[in-house]
Amino acid sequence: MSHRYIPLTEQDKKEMLDTIGASSISELFGDVPKDILLNRELAIPDGEAETTLTKRLSRIASKNVTKETHSSFLGAGVYDHYAPAVVDAMISRSEFYTAYTPYQPEISQGELQAIFEFQTLICELTDMDIANSSMYDGITSFAEACILAFNQTRKNKIVVSKGLHYQALQVLKTYVKTREEFEVVEVDLDGTITDLEKLENAIDDDTAAVAVQYPNFYGSIEDLEKIHSFIEDKKALFIVYANPLALGLLTPPGSFGADIVVGDTQPFGIPAQFGGPHCGFFATTKKLMRKIPGRLVGQTEDGDGNRGFVLTLQAREQHIRRDKATSNICSNQALNALASSICMSALGKQGIYDISVQNFENANYAKAQFKEAGLEVSNGTSFNEFVVKFNKPVKDINDALLQQDIIGGFDLSEVSKDYENQMLVAVTELRTKDEIDTFVKKAGELNGSK
């Protein structure tokens, strides 16, 4: 008897075998040599009742360490922020949840308008002219920005600060690995911030672009105005990898003359989930509009004069120009872009500003507590991350903290041995005063501080 919801019943098997003229499964696989044919049943247990299975999986899941069971001070690119309940409610609508690239605008106006709103929000945050419909993640956006700079300027050198996320630097090097003419010059830091003298000396007439992070990977806030002054007469592009939440408080890169602003909207409505998926953004100037990678949604009018939305400037893309396309990127992160759009819209300008201030104040409170506990904090001005120096390996301290329901900061020795015994601590709006005090107290005790 066929079963309506369970596939591959005995009746299903019989009907398929009859259709192809085989009397049994053994006859179906008769061409497979006997010496390699599996001659036993697969060791798969019988099915369980849904109630039993749910309980068993819940027991297994309860062994996980999560930000719901522990207070988390881990950041380094993935942060523990609050997402309003409306985010999941809205993105769970089937029209959004199952949609793909809206090639047919006449039946995809809702999806296209949602993407258009995302582009608009990114432009407002970054103070740039145009933004694409999103990219896979912030690091992909950064690497694509560098490729754009090479192609636009026809120069072969990118000057990058070592204050950029170390994985962003790795991805960039992977992108240019097969292009021997391209050179990536890394500029050292002075403590936790870019050494401006070395940066200025590294920039010359062969420089395609200068790239920095804002705030940088170590939490410090780079002097974008000063850096831009080094670039102006060199005809190089200025690329800024920015934390979009920080832009609720900090002056946006566009105000400092940035040519391309990229980043990751994970702080807006995208949970910290095994490192992804994320949502990269890419914003630039009108001058570079036809060089931008990825999808672009534009606003137009139909034959009756009604406002409508379409995919525009598609001649840049792979499905039109193939090998002459501006990028190999031919998709986006529509669902996560929608989540970020809903989150930003729900918070509003004031809400984004308020959360940015909470991050800044919580981090500065934590910095002061660490200093009071006798630990050295490397940063001057920072947003919601900073570096703390310990006397012992950070791994040992984090292992001990985990036993006390605390997820410690990122172990910077994973980036370089130069950062041995140094922890990158992230403090978001979700950390309470009690959680911060407990974290500092326990970390100080484990370090042997006062």
Swiss-Prot record:
HAMAP family: GcvPA. The gene is gcvPA. Signal peptide: none annotated. One of its GO terms (biological process) is nucleoside metabolic process. Keywords: Oxidoreductase. It holds the Pfam family GDC-P. The glycine cleavage system catalyzes the degradation of glycine. The P protein binds the alpha-amino group of glycine through its pyridoxal phosphate cofactor; CO(2) is released and the remaining methylamine moiety is then transferred to the lipoamide cofactor of the H protein. It is an enzyme of class 1 (oxidoreductase). It comes from Staphylococcus saprophyticus subsp. saprophyticus (strain ATCC 15305 / DSM 20229 / NCIMB 8711 / NCTC 7292 / S-41). The glycine cleavage system is composed of four proteins: P, T, L and H. In this organism, the P 'protein' is a heterodimer of two subunits. Its EC number is 1.4.4.2. InterPro entries: GcvPA (IPR023010), GDC-P_N (IPR049315), GDC_P (IPR020581), PyrdxlP-dep_Trfase (IPR015424), PyrdxlP-dep_Trfase_major (IPR015421), PyrdxlP-dep_Trfase_small (IPR015422). Coiled coil: none annotated. It catalyses: N(6)-[(R)-lipoyl]-L-lysyl-[glycine-cleavage complex H protein] + glycine + H(+) = N(6)-[(R)-S(8)-aminomethyldihydrolipoyl]-L-lysyl-[glycine-cleavage complex H protein] + CO2. Belongs to the GcvP family. N-terminal subunit subfamily. This is Probable glycine dehydrogenase (decarboxylating) subunit 1. One of its GO terms (molecular function) is glycine dehydrogenase (decarboxylating) activity.
